[in-house]
Regions:
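N-terminal metal-binding scaffold of metallo-dependent hydrolase/deaminase domains
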Residues: 1-42, 376
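Alpha-helical scaffold segments that flank or form the walls of functional sites
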Residues: 54, 72-136, 157-171
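Hydrophobic faces of well-ordered beta-strands that scaffold small-molecule active sites
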Residues: 58-64, 118-119, 138-141, 176-180, ...
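Active-site gating loops and adjacent loop-to-helix segments of metal-dependent hydrolytic enzymes
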Residues: 70-101, 135, 139-145, 212-258
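Active-site glycine- and acidic-residue-rich loops that bind
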Residues: 120, 179-195, 264-266, 291-294
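His/Asp/Glu-enriched, well-ordered alpha-helical/loop segment
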Residues: 251-256, 285, 296-373
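C-terminal cap of metal-dependent C-N hydrolases
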Residues: 349, 365-402
Length: 402
């Protein structure tokens, strides 16, 4: 067993506890949360104390690209379509071993930042393998691509084969999902096919959606840089005269999939918000990445007012620079307990994991993080955790043997 005491404990779903403690059972779940004097210290339990720090639920990063960790600082391009082409070139020059090392470093960087659960999208499978090898928690969404309708069958078969291979790696802690990448990289028939596949196999699904003005121009008007690139490849493009969110509704895919995570959702209006709410979609808000690419500002307040589950994500380190979720919260205009809620239980709800993680409650998974008390002030001086624990196992920081 493990007992962690801190100057203040923040359960998130209950008021903060001054001089509090959390007791972790041998099964990796929380046995007790309360004032220090009320939480027992069983014989033989390990104990650690942080009198000047805050103990919080482990942070939840709702959107990462861990396989790109090694590319930090290597793509100065900010015009979005050119940035994407540069990323593809850099990935083409990366070996499978380099992707594996990159993803593992990304997981460790998350632990250093107090992140205990990630929702990662990628094309190589390296993030899922890294999560499984290191005993991390997360959902990995295997990306599917195929903008040409003529390639639907081949693109779907490629994605399904990847899911079969990776299915042997997935577990209850490291889950597998699929991601039909984005409206500019996935055709209408492929969207429908992947959504049907996800529903049949009970796989969570994530999509980059309404991220950029270029994407909106493609869907609404059949114009812009994405449309030009597709036509240059001989791929037919037509105007749908609607927003990207409304486009997916028209395709029927919002009804075809369960566990849907929409990433970014910057270019949205009130009708889009109503669609997302009715579809019970979770959102990943990535303000630093949106700012880096000059996409605009997602309407976070409107998301929350509409009752749409939304968490914060760092996107790739190529865009945001690091996996500092406190900096992400500051970029979203949040601080204190409001920031903490967004980084924990709100993110867990966006991923459909709120019954297991996101708050400090007896019976939940013992995913914990300890930070200097100053982390609850904006801007955070440091995102480095003093201690990070996943399912009762310390993965970052020091715990005495006895």
């Amino acid at each position: 067993m493990l007992r962690v005491r801190a100057g203040s404990v923040h359960p998130v779903t209950a008021p903060p506890i001054s001089d509090g403690a959390v007791l972790v059972a041998d099964d990796g779940r929380i046995a007790a949360v309360g004032a220090h004097a009320d939480v027992p210290l069983p014989p033989g339990a390990r104990r650690v104390e942080f009198p000047d720090a805050v103990l919080v639920p482990g942070l939840v990063n709702t959107h990462t690209h861990l396989e790109l960790t090694h590319l930090a600082g290597r793509n100065p391009e900010r015009e979005f379509s050119r940035w994407i082409r540069t990323i593809r070139s850099l990935k083409d020059a990366t070996t499978p071993e380099e992707f594996d090392h990159s993803a593992e470093q990304g997981v460790r960087d998350c632990w250093t930042a107090g992140v205990t659960c990630v929702a990662d999208t990628g094309s190589t499978g390296a993030p899922l393998r890294a999560l499984a090898r290191l005993g991390a928690r997360g959902i990995y969404y295997q990306e599917g691509f195929g903008p040409d309708p003529a390639d639907r069958a081949a693109s779907l078969a490629e994605l399904q084969a990847a899911v079969v291979r990776l299915g042997h790696v997935a577990s209850a802690r490291t889950r597998l999902g699929v991601s039909p990448h984005a409206p500019y990289s996935v055709s209408e028939p492929l969207y429908r096919a992947v959504a049907d596949f996800a529903r049949r196999e009970s796989l969570p699904l994530a999509v980059h959606l309404a991220e950029s003005r270029e994407e909106t121009a493609l869907v609404r008007d059949g114009a812009g840089s994405f449309a030009e690139a597709l036509r240059a490849r001989g791929i037919p493009v037509r105007a749908h005269h609607c927003s990207p969110v409304q486009y997916l509704l028209q395709l029927g895919v919002l009804e075809r999939a369960t566990g849907w995570l929409s990433i970014h959702c910057v270019q949205v209006d009130e009708r889009d918000l109503d669609i997302l709410r009715q579809a019970r979609v979770g959102l990943a808000h990535c303000p630093r990445s949106n700012r880096a690419h000059r996409h605009g500002t997602a309407p976070l307040a409107a998301f929350r007012a509409a009752g749409i589950p939304v968490g914060l994500g760092t996107d790739s380190v190529v865009s945001a620079g690091d996996v500092n979720l406190w900096a992400e919260a500051a970029a979203a205009g949040l601080d204190g307990e409001d920031a903490l809620r967004m980084l924990t239980i709100a993110g867990a709800r966006a991923l459909g994991l709120e019954s297991e993680i996101g708050s400090l409650e007896a019976g939940k998974q013992a995913d914990l993080a300890v930070f200097p008390a100053t982390v609850l002030h904006r801007p955070p001086p440091s995102s480095t955790a003093l201690l990070t624990v996943i399912a009762g196992r310390p993965v970052h920081g020091y715990i005495p043997a006895q």
